[in-house]
Regions:
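Long, highly hydrophobic alpha-helical transmembrane signal-anchor segments
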Residues: 1-11, 139-141, 147-159
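N-terminal signal-anchor transmembrane alpha helix
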Residues: 2-31
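Nucleotide and nucleotide-moiety/phosphate-recognizing core
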Residues: 6, 57-63, 67-96, 116-120, ...
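Transmembrane alpha-helix interface/packing and boundary motifs in multi-pass membrane proteins
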Residues: 13-24, 93-100, 134-139
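Cytosolic, membrane-interface loops and tails of multi-pass inner-membrane proteins
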Residues: 25-56, 184-206
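Interfacial segments of multi-pass membrane proteins
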Residues: 50-53, 76-79, 97, 105-137, ...
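Loop-to-transmembrane alpha-helix initiation sites
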Residues: 120-127, 141-149, 160-173
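C-terminal membrane-associated helical module and adjoining short loops/tails
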Residues: 155-206
Length: 206
C-alpha cells in the first residue's frame, strides 16, 4: 500500500495534466478562436493551430502539449523509480488524459522525453516518425501515426528490458492507435505510400 499511493498520486497528476487541452485553450483565450470549429478534422491539436493560426502560436501550443507529458513523468522519476510496474500508469496517464478529446501525438513524445536522460526511448518513436514523414511517406497522416507507433512498440519490446516501460509504452500505443483508428474508419481514407525523395536518376533513364 505504501508503494501504491505515491504512484497513484503521480498517475492522477499526469492524467489531469494531460487533460488540459492547450491547443484549444490558448487560441480561445488569446485569439478568441475555437480551433475545433475552424479546423478540417475538429482536432484540438498543435498541428491545427499551426495551420489555422500561425507558426509562432503553433509552437507555443506544441511546447505546452509536450511539457504536460514531460513534467509528471520527470517529477515521478525524481521521487520514485520505474522498477515498480505501477510506473506504467504514470507513463500512460498524460496520454490517456489528452486522448479523451485529442489525438495525443505531442503528449506521447512528452512522456517519453520525461524519461531522459535515464532512457532514450523517445528515439524509438522519433526515428520511424521521421522516416515515414520524409523518405517513405504514408498518407493520410493518421496511417503514418499508426505505423510509426507500431514500429515504436515493437522496438521497445526488443530493446527495453524493463517491464514497466514496456507496459507503459504499450498503453500509450494502444491509446494513440485507437484514436487514429477511429479517425481512419470515420473518413474511409485508404493507405497511400509515396517516396519522399525525388528519384531523378530514374526519370533521366526514362
Amino acid at each position: 500500500m505504501q508503494d501504491l499511493i505515491p504512484y497513484l498520486i503521480f498517475t492522477m497528476i499526469g492524467y489531469l495534466s494531460g487533460s488540459v487541452m492547450y491547443s484549444k485553450l490558448l487560441p480561445s483565450l488569446f485569439k478568441h478562436v475555437d480551433i475545433t470549429k475552424i479546423s478540417d478534422d475538429g482536432n484540438p491539436g498543435a498541428g491545427n493551430v499551426f495551420k489555422n493560426i500561425g507558426p509562432s502560436f503553433g509552437m507555443l501550443c506544441l511546447f505546452c502539449d509536450i511539457f504536460k507529458g514531460i513534467i509528471p513523468v520527470a517529477l515521478c522519476l525524481y521521487y520514485l523509480t520505474w522498477d515498480n510496474p505501477l510506473f506504467s500508469m504514470v507513463l500512460a496517464a498524460p496520454v490517456l488524459g489528452h486522448a479523451r478529446k485529442g489525438k495525443a501525438i505531442a503528449v506521447s513524445f512528452g512522456v517519453l522525453l520525461g524519461l531522459l536522460p535515464s532512457s532514450w526511448m523517445v528515439l524509438y518513436l522519433a526515428v520511424p516518425f521521421i522516416f515515414f514523414s520524409t523518405l517513405v511517406r504514408f498518407n493520410p497522416h493518421a496511417w503514418r501515426v499508426v505505423i510509426a507507433f507500431l514500429c515504436f512498440i515493437l522496438t521497445v519490446y526488443v530493446r527495453v528490458p524493463i517491464p514497466a516501460l514496456q507496459l507503459g509504452a504499450l498503453l500509450v500505443t494502444i491509446t494513440v492507435v485507437a484514436r487514429h483508428g477511429i479517425y481512419i474508419k470515420s473518413t474511409h481514407e485508404k493507405l497511400r505510400v509515396d517516396l519522399g525523395w525525388n528519384p531523378g536518376w530514374l526519370k533521366r533513364r526514362e
